[in-house]
């Protein structure tokens, strides 16, 4: 009986740990600005994501697609975030790092060129206009 309880406790702890460290199902971007945003990835941070976020909208990209865009399934992925990407003169907010294993995005806040990116949870950001 004691062995059975220990087995159940270990299984419950294992499931709880997996749930705590699980990656998000989607990468979500809430764009609360008047302009389209996009992430650029790749070795030179010059490959535009095929999933820009339109002005005043929320864009969700399945986590598996994020991994494909980043070119790997684990580790970290750097992305250069730009605004006004549907114009001839896009502006850069800056570079963020996405942990593909946990969904953690760093830095937690980034402000440049009149825009701010704020991380609001694993795999989730909000972009505002200053």
Task: State where each predicted segment sits.
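Bacterial N-terminal signal peptides that target proteins for export
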Residues: 1-9
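Intrinsically disordered, low-complexity segments enriched in small/polar residues
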Residues: 21-130
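N-terminal signal peptide c-region/cleavage motif recognized by signal peptidases
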Residues: 17-19
């Amino acid at each position: 009986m004691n062995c059975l309880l220990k087995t159940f406790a270990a299984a419950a702890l294992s499931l709880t740990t997996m749930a705590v460290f699980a990656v998000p199902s989607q990468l979500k971007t809430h764009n609360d600005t008047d302009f389209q945003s996009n992430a650029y990835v790749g070795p030179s941070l010059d490959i535009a994501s095929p999933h820009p976020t339109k002005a005043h909208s929320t864009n969700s990209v399945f986590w598996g697609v994020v991994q494909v865009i980043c070119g790997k399934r684990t580790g970290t992925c750097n992305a250069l975030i730009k605004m006004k990407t549907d114009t001839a003169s896009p502006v850069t907010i800056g570079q963020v790092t996405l942990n593909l294993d946990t969904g953690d995005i760093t830095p937690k806040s980034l402000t440049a060129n009149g825009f701010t990116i704020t991380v609001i949870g694993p795999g989730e950001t909000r972009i505002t206009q200053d």
